[in-house]
């Protein structure tokens, strides 16, 4: 099994000398308040058969989104690392988004856009404004995808957005962000219903990523992740799921190799 080549579809990097990441100031983020560069990623994955990776935007300060995109696209162009594409940051709720996107949409390394919907200052329904929907439809016109990263209780918002953008591909990050903690299951019914509903649309894909960060540091076991992962496999089927390492965010609870090997066990 270890010999199967792996594409990591959710690779983060950040250089705190270049970028401001406001969310690193939140409680519990101490281990992430460092720079994480390509050399660090290669060391973290050296015992795993990663052959390619796709950069995932890191929720930089909005004023730095253009600079972040330029930075990672330069890495994609280099031949000394596995990065072969990027999902760049952007602000689809803003009228300036179309002009911003025009700068990058022709770059073959740009695969899609993400904006985080679950930050504390981002209210429910943020992705349902007319401006937001218009800009997500624009992504579809350009052959680009949109990554959904939101609170599990609000997944019905994603259903409405998908329905409103019939030509756009969507990727659900982190299995829909449903926690694996037994005492945090109050949103499970809404999450399951929303995931089933989105799985009915063949333009929606599910990324097996991120959920290890909701496990208990130091004591978690692969079995703790199995219920959520099995649900996603059963709901979307093997042709519409893929792996994302979510490094270095996964290091809140696990190193890359232990997370990867947990998935092999599952």
Q: Which residue ranges define each predicted feature?
A:
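Active-site metal-binding loops of divalent metal-dependent hydrolases
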Residues: 11, 58, 175, 246-247
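Histidine-centered divalent metal-coordination motifs
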Residues: 10-14, 149, 174
């Amino acid at each position: 099994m270890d010999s199967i080549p792996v594409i990591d579809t959710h690779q983060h990097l950040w250089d705190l000398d270049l970028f401001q990441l406001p969310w690193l100031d939140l409680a519990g983020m101490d281990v992430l308040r460092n720079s994480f560069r390509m050399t660090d990623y290669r060391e973290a994955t050296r015992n795993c058969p990663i052959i390619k990776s796709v950069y995932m935007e890191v929720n930089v300060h909005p004023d730095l989104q253009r600079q972040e995109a330029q930075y990672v696209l330069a890495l994609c162009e280099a031949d000394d690392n596995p990065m072969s594409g990027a999902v760049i940051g952007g602000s689809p709720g803003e009228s300036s988004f179309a002009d911003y996107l025009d700068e990058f949409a022709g770059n073959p390394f740009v695969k899609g856009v993400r904006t985080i919907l679950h930050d504390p200052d981002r209210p429910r329904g943020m992705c349902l404004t007319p401006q937001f929907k218009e800009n997500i439809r624009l992504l579809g016109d350009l052959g680009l995808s949109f990554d959904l990263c939101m609170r599990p209780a609000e997944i019905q918002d994603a259903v409405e957005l998908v329905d409103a953008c019939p030509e756009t591909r969507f990727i659900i990050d982190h299995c829909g962000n449903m926690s694996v903690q037994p005492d945090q299951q109050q949103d499970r019914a809404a999450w399951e219903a929303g995931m089933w509903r989105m799985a009915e649309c063949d333009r929606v894909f599910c990324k097996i990523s991120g959920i290890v960060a909701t496990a208990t540091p130091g004591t978690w076991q692969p079995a703790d992740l199995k219920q959520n992962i099995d649900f996603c496999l059963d709901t979307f089927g093997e042709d519409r799921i893929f792996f994302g390492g979510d490094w270095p965010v996964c290091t809140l609870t696990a190193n890359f190799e232990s997370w990867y090997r947990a998935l092999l066990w599952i």
